[in-house]
Each structure stands twice: as C-alpha cells, then as structure tokens.
Amino acid sequence: MSTEASVASKWTRPDDFIKLQRLKQKKNKLAARVSNNNNRRPRHQVDETDKSKLLEAKLAQKRKNPFAKSTADAKKLRVDPQLADLEPVVTASSCFVRETPTRPAPAKFVLQKYDPQAFAKLFQHPQINAEDEDDAELAARQKHTAHLPVDWSLKTRARFFCPTELPAIQLKTSQLASGLTSFVRCMDPQRTESTLDISDATRFNQCNYYWQHPHLPWLTLYPRTAKENVGVVVGERERKALAEEWDFSFRGLFQLLRARQCPYFYLCANTFTVLFRAAGVGGRPESHALVTPSTRGMRQALRQEGIEFSMPLKSDNSGNAHDNSFNEESTTTSLGPEAGEDAPPPAQEDEDDDEDWLESLGVDERELRRIQSSHARKQQAAEMREDFSDNSLLLVDGVECQGFFSYLLNAKSAISTVGRLAGVPPTLLSPVAFPKATMQHLVPRSKKVRLDGVDYFSIDIKGLILPTFLPSVAELLSETRQMFSSTLASSINTLAFSKATQKLLETPETPQSDAEGEDAAGQVFGEQNLSECGLLPAVVGSICRTGQHAVGLLERVCYQRDEGYAWS
C-alpha cells in the first residue's frame, strides 16, 4: 500500500497542471512588464518554443504604419532661379491672405479746440446714415389715412403685433357660444340688446368664421393646386351628386347677391377665380363680376354667348399695328347690341377694303388666303399675349352679370374633368350663410415675441382670409388698443381684383365736377341698401367707400390712435 501511495503522489492531476500553467504565464507577464518599464533591454528575448511569449512580444512591439511614406523620396517643387528673381511665387495660401480683408489701421485721435457752438450745430445739421434714409423713404411711401382701405385679394396668412395684450384665443364656454351665435345670426352684440358676451375675445372669435361649399375634409379646396390633391379620384356617382349640390348652392348664393343679402362671394375654379359683388360695393351701381385670369378661348366663348365685357387693366400702349387692330376689336365688345348691328366694326371695314385693293392689283386668290391666314395668326398671337396675367381681368357689369351666371352654371369647363380635383365643382366662399354651405373657422395662435428689446404680443392666423376679416379686426383693435400692426400674405391669383377696383375708382365715367357728389351719394345709398347683408356697419361702410384710398393692396398695416392707419 505504501508503494501505491508513493506512485500516486508522483502523478500530477489536470487541475494542478492548469494552475501551474496559469501561474507560470502570470510570472512571465509580470517579468515582461517590469522589463518594459525599466527599459532594461531594447527587445524581448523570445523563446520560440513558448507560444504565449511569442504572442506577448507581438503585442508589445509597436505596429508599423502601412501608409507611412519616406520623406527622402518626396517630390520637391522645381524653382527656376531666373524666374524666381523676376516675380514672387504665388501660392494658394498667399492668395488667401492677400484676398482676405484686414482690419484698417486705427484712426488717430486728435483733440480740437473747444467750440461752444459745436453742440448747437449738431441739432441744426443732423447726420443721417443709410438706415435713417431708408426709414425716411419708407415713411414717405406710407399713406396715413383715417380709415383702412379694403383689399379685395384673398389672404393666406395674417399676423398681428401689439405692445399690450391681444384678445385671448383660449375661450370660455360663454365666449365661444356668444361668438358663434353672433356670427350665425349676423348680430352686433354691442348695438343690440341681448345677453350675449361682448368681450374682446368673443368679438375676435366672431371674425374668424366664414362659409364654404363644397367642403370635403380630406381635400384642400383652396388653393385648388395644393399638393395634397394629387392622386384623388372621384367616382362618377360622386361627381353627379357634387354637381347637383353645387348647382343648387350656386343658384341660392347668386339670388342672395341680387337681393343684396350677400355683399360678395368668390367662385374659385382650377384655372380662374370670379368675384361677384352686389350693387353698391366698390362704387358700382349694379351687381357685377370680376374674372381673373382669362384666356383667349374664354373671351371667345363669352362673345359667342353674347356676353359683353371689358378689360380695365388691359394696357393701351401698342407697339405695332396688330395690337391696334386688337384694341379696336376689344373695345367693340363693350358696345351695345344696337351699335353692333347698325354698322360693322371699323377693323372689319378696313380688312374688306384691303382685300378689295389686293384683288384689284391682280393678286392670286391662293396668295390672298395665305396673307389672310398669316394676318389672323398675328392677331391671335397679339390677343393671347396677356393671357393668364393680371391684365387679362374681365369686368362683367349690369345685366350681363346674369348672363355670365348662366354661362358658369351650364359651362362644362367650370368643373374640371382631368387633373387635380377632377370632378369637384368650384369652391364657393362667402361671409354670410347660403344654401348647402359649411361653416369654417380660422384657428389663431398666440405667442409672445421680443423685437429690439421690446416684448410684443402676437396672433398668427393661417388659412383662407376674406377681405372683410381685416376691417372687422381693425375696428375691434382700434377701439381697445392705442396701437397695433399687422402683416399680410396675399394669394397671387387674386391681386388683380384690388388693382381693377382701384383703377375703376380712379377713372370715373362722370365729369370731375359731379364725380365727388355722385360718389358721396352712391356710398350713402350703397350702405343703406346693404344694411341687411349680415356685416357690421363699419365693414359695410369700408366696402362701399368710393373716395381716395378706398382700395389698396395691403402688405403691412400700422395703427396709432393719434395718427390713424399707415399702410404699404
């Protein structure tokens, strides 16, 4: 037994062998670390038989950079000594330094003799810098008026600034209900005896509503060219239902306009926009319509239907004879039917005389037809030159407005069959209720901004803004605030409405001596006839105003109680 125990003790167990191996590795690592720290030897003496030592030595050595490049073989710039003497070497760094502006040398401070009148001279001859000159020019361009002009273009955004707090947009239950009731019933809470709330927040909420038809929540019906409308398909059954609803709504809205129960409304199609206005609005004694933009095909279709129109913004300056012939032809469209039937247009007589003269000279009939077709193409090109521009605006006035209404009601081109919103009727927009209409609401957002070290309260409104919105809000703020300002963004397609109205007011048909009296009388009768149209009396007075600065394109409006309105 003793011999077996001695033999067993000579054998090494596997766990003991592993412990010895690990202990040996730790000793080797410690020795290598000490040798590296003390720099006793420049390089490790590696035993090739020990794999662990080889791995440690490989890790301890510094890895060679594979991208290193020898500086001995580097390329050097060859410099010709003769050229070096003639001109200096221009490098990228020297160009950069040379082109970079440097700070000018400080001016010398020189003390001058005391002048007792120097301070007084500063007040007599003030120095004006470039910013002051720009402010002076802007102040000169701004027009100060006691009233705010009306802008007949549709707005897409409005922002109001005021140093004092603006009306609250977080409404209470009574304020929301009172504003909604006042708008639907066309009431002025301040002038009628009622229990409705008359706070500023309620009145401001009343200004944010308008009526629209049709209303499809998943589509953007103004502007009708919005990106969200791409790929929208309307079925045949839906198209028929929308057309029937729109027909009934358009008829009812136009009847309200003729009865002066609606002051104005917009018809927004894919390719044109129409503004219908009641009698007395914009200085016109009868109901009328403004169409922008128009095309040669549309004007030709109106002529074929016997609808007379005029183009108030059309430029009269013509550069050639073809434009003159077109101007003469366009002016004949505004003549009465009797004048057109009694005598042919002068342009047509001239063309007949020219043809007879060419035939008398023996010109071939084929050549004559070629000349006639060339002349007709030139006339068409001259007539199409102003298509899709503000100058192509059409004015349909008086009894012709009824014919134009029937034309839009039956025209197939009013409802687009292809493209965006195919099959969706034009959008009808009105400040008062009409059949099949849906009430819409502008959502204001308030915030506090800091400009030039001064805190301002701001209200930002995004959406479709009708022309009567700004006069209503301005009337409210002018009563309760000392000063405020507003910036507006207009829809480009409707700028021609304000331009045409302004030009029609500046060129009256009556003589200058009788114009002022008739304008004042027309304004009074217009306000009286539109007293039941559903708008506030101050707003009715602004849209019926015919004096100076009655209409204008508004981008920025400032108000101070002592000076009035300044706008540009």
UniProtKB/Swiss-Prot annotation:
Gene Ontology CC terms, in alphabetical order: nucleus
Q: Where is this region: Disordered?
A: 28-48, 311-355
Superkingdom: Eukaryota
Entry's transmembrane regions: none
Tissue distribution:
Expression peaks during late G1 and S phase (at protein level).
Name the job this protein performs.
Answer: Essential for DNA amplification in the ovary and required for cell proliferation during development.
Question: What protein does this entry describe?
Answer: Protein downstream neighbor of son homolog
Taxon lineage: Eukaryota, Metazoa, Ecdysozoa, Arthropoda, Hexapoda
Q: What gene makes this protein?
A: hd
